[in-house]
């Protein structure tokens, strides 16, 4: 019979952050593109496509930050140079901004969507916030890429 604690031990050792982190990047980008198309050609797409994608992006961003915190704790034990630790801290800060920004934006968007169902101004405002969130996600992804490809964080 399999021992459940061995399975949980294996899950804790597997680096999940690299696998999960790409979902919020892709979903925020897709939400921005689809919402922009919906504003440009309203009859082509449903108004809720970007909203649904933003919901999934928020969930995946929460998972990415939680797994990233686990990976940062592992990186702290390795003893990287100060420059690398500063970049890790900056990456964590941008990740937290993405998560909390996504949560607040999603709750606000859902509330205003149901309050003002057919207001084009809400859609334009949502597009502006999606663009801002996309920029922050891009900066966070860039710092994460620097950590991996330049500083070797998370590589064997």
Predicted features and spans:
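Polytopic transmembrane helical bundles with strong interfacial aromatic enrichment
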Residues: 4-156
């Amino acid at each position: 019979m399999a021992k459940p604690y061995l399975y949980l031990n294996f899950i804790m050792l597997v680096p999940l952050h690299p696998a999960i982190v790409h979902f919020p990047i892709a979903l925020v980008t897709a939400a921005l593109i689809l919402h922009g198309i919906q504003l440009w050609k309203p009859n082509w797409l449903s108004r809720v496509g970007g909203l649904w994608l933003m919901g999934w992006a928020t969930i995946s961003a929460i998972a990415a930050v939680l797994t990233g915190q686990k990976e940062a704790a592992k990186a702290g034990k390795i003893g990287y140079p100060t420059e690398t630790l500063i970049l890790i801290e900056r990456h964590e800060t941008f990740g937290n901004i993405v998560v909390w920004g996504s949560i607040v934006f999603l709750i606000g968007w859902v509330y205003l969507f149901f309050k003002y169902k057919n207001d084009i101004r809400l859609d334009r405002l949502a597009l502006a916030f999606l663009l801002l969130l996309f920029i922050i996600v891009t900066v966070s992804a860039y710092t994460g890429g620097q950590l991996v490809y330049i500083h070797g964080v998370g590589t064997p």
